[in-house]
Swiss-Prot record:
It catalyses: a dipeptide(out) + ATP + H2O = a dipeptide(in) + ADP + phosphate + H(+). The complex is composed of two ATP-binding proteins (DppD and DppF), two transmembrane proteins (DppB and DppC) and a solute-binding protein (DppA). MppA can replace DppA as binding protein for heme and ALA transport. Keywords: ATP-binding, Cell inner membrane, Cell membrane, Membrane, Nucleotide-binding, Peptide transport, Protein transport, Translocase, Transport. It is a peripheral membrane protein. The keyword Cytoplasm does not apply. This is Dipeptide transport ATP-binding protein DppD. It is an enzyme of class 7 (translocase). Residues 4-254 form the ABC transporter domain.
Length: 327
């Protein structure tokens, strides 16, 4: 049984008669102890879909789904009180920018202990010791003294470690990490990902890694979900997708990586940008940018089809093992 079950999730903004479909009928599941990577450019709907799961989409946003379940609970039907008890305790999220996610007016220790107090209670000394243990667990040196510092006194990497400590304070079953390495240097990025995977294995929690960097999740994730313009365009085993993508967009993301560069002088890029509300093309949303697009692609939206190898691809002409479209 899946821990998280998402079926035809949509998030719309703006006028109901002509909404902007930030997330458009996406479906996926996450099992206990599984690492899932959600990949795509900025504007693909990765973060919005996760905010919808957390119940953090405010008006004028509208969340619709045929099924949105966590651990057997229908997230669309639970009360606000039930959701508050769930979020932060059983489901937690690490946001993109730790420097703006932490409250600058309160010490690091107060913010961690507040999360523990809300969901687990306990006396002040117990909460303080738990906060020290958490900071030690995420690799912050001299954790007892760091409880009394303010966010502005920490580096970006240390701030992100504090955010991770807050997220795992109540031992969640599902942790969503939204671009957890944004604005960090390459060395710190590797340390943060290594830390998240170490915690995931130790606690046997499900981990959803949201990123624009396919290489970041290729080795860490069991399964990869590729999103484009609010839609899922490819899903499947991480190793298989990394070595033989079935969708042109996934192929383009891979070709932009240095290790896949065919031209050693210049990295490949996909021309154009992710379409917004007013420039969404007919047919396949990728067709203006796709080198393989045909008249059929420009007229008819493809379905997300199950392929023979168990993967899914939203393409009329899924790529073969050699990277060529099956025209």
């Amino acid at each position: 049984m899946a821990l998280l079950n998402v079926d035809k999730l949509s998030v719309h903004f703006g006028d109901e008669s002509a909404p902007f479909r930030a997330v458009d009928r996406i479906s996926y599941s996450v099992k206990q102890g599984e690492v899932v990577g959600i990949v795509g450019e900025s504007g693909s709907g990765k973060s919005v879909s996760s905010l919808a799961i957390m119940g953090l989409i405010d008006y004028p946003g509208r969340v619709m789904a045929e099924k949105l379940e966590f651990n057997g609970q229908d997230l669309q039907r639970i009360s606000e009180k039930e959701r508050r008890n769930l979020v932060g305790a059983e489901v937690a999220m690490i946001f993109q920018d730790p420097m703006t996610s932490l409250n600058p007016c309160y010490t690091v220790g107060f913010q961690i202990m507040e999360a523990i107090k809300v969901h687990q209670g306990g006396n002040k000394s117990t909460r303080r010791q738990r906060a020290i243990d958490l900071l030690n667990q995420v690799g912050i040196p001299d954790p007892a003294s760091r409880l009394d510092v303010y966010p502005h006194q920490l580096s970006g990497g240390m701030s992100q470690r504090v955010m991770i400590a807050m997220a795992i304070a109540c031992r969640p079953k599902l942790l969503i990490a939204d671009e957890p390495t944004t604005a960090l240097d390459v060395t710190i990025q590797a340390q943060i990902i290594e830390l998240l995977l170490e915690l995931q294995q130790k606690e046997n929690m499900a981990l959803v890694l949201i990123t624009h960097d396919l290489a970041l999740v290729a080795e860490a994730a069991h399964k990869i979900i590729v999103m484009y313009a609010g839609q899922v365009v490819e899903t499947g085993d991480a190793h298989a997708i990394f070595h033989a993508p079935r969708h042109p967009y996934t192929q383009a993301l891979l070709r932009a990586l240095p290790e896949f560069a065919q031209d050693k002088e210049r990295l490949a890029s996909l021309p154009g940008v992710v379409p917004g509300k007013y420039d969404r093309p007919n047919g396949c949303l990728l067709n203006p940018r796709c080198p393989y697009a045909t008249d059929r692609c420009r007229a008819e939206e493809p379905a997300l089809n199950m392929l023979a190898d168990g993967r899914q691809s939203k393409c009329h002409y899924p790529l073969d093992d050699a990277g060529r479209p099956t025209l």
